[in-house]
Every structure is written in structure tokens, then in C-alpha cells.
């Protein structure tokens, strides 16, 4: 009986497959500054460089400028935490809590640090 249960358990795990990233959903880089600036340029170059290693994935750059970067940051804070919406910000993000009174997100807990560019 134990052998039959073990074989059934193994058979059930064979149907499970690892999810591939990013799948069919595009990856969006949100740049909280106007198009044509240095942060926008870095995001566009990064998106182009990441296309091939990610198997030709669709990478978009979304400029959400305004309020010193807090509009774009808020957009990312409210996005689904699925790894498909990334924020490309600069040092202003670190000073925002002390300079902006009522930001609609928490800089230290609403974001997950991915890396430095």
C-alpha cells in the first residue's frame, strides 16, 4: 500500500512545471521622470540589453513624471507584486520621506530592492 501511495505522489509531481519568467506578460520599467532624461535613457538601454537574455521578452519603459518622482513610485507601489513592474529611480528616493510630507507609500517597506545600476 505504501508503495502505491508513493508512486501516486510521484505521479502527481510530474504534472507540475516550473513557471518561466517573465512568461507572456511584459516587464515594465517605470521611470518617474520625463522622457529624454538620463534616467529614461538608462532604462531604455537596460530594457534593450535584457531582451535577449530573457528570451525576447517584451520590456516597456513607462515615464510617469511629476512630484519629484513620487507619482511613478506610487504607481509601482500599487502594482501587483509579481516582478513585472520595476521602478528605476535615483538618490531622490532616499531623501523623499524627509522632504515630502504626505507621500502615499512607504519607501522602506513598499518596495523590494533588486539591484544597483
What would you call each of these model-derived segments?
Residues 10-18:
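Hydrophobic h-region of N-terminal signal peptides that target proteins for export
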Residues 2-7:
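Sec-dependent signal peptide recognition
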Amino acid at each position: 500500500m505504501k508503495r502505491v501511495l508513493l508512486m501516486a505522489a510521484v505521479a502527481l509531481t510530474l504534472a507540475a512545471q516550473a513557471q518561466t519568467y517573465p512568461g507572456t506578460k511584459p516587464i515594465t520599467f517605470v521611470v518617474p521622470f520625463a522622457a529624454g532624461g538620463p534616467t529614461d535613457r538608462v532604462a531604455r538601454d537596460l530594457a534593450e540589453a535584457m531582451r535577449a537574455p530573457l528570451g525576447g521578452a517584451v520590456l516597456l519603459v513607462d515615464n510617469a513624471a511629476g512630484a519629484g518622482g513620487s507619482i511613478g513610485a506610487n504607481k509601482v507601489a500599487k502594482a501587483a507584486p509579481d516582478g513585472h513592474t520595476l521602478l528605476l529611480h535615483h538618490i531622490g528616493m532616499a531623501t523623499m520621506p524627509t522632504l515630502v510630507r504626505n507621500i502615499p507609500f512607504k519607501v522602506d517597506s513598499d518596495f523590494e530592492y533588486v539591484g544597483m545600476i
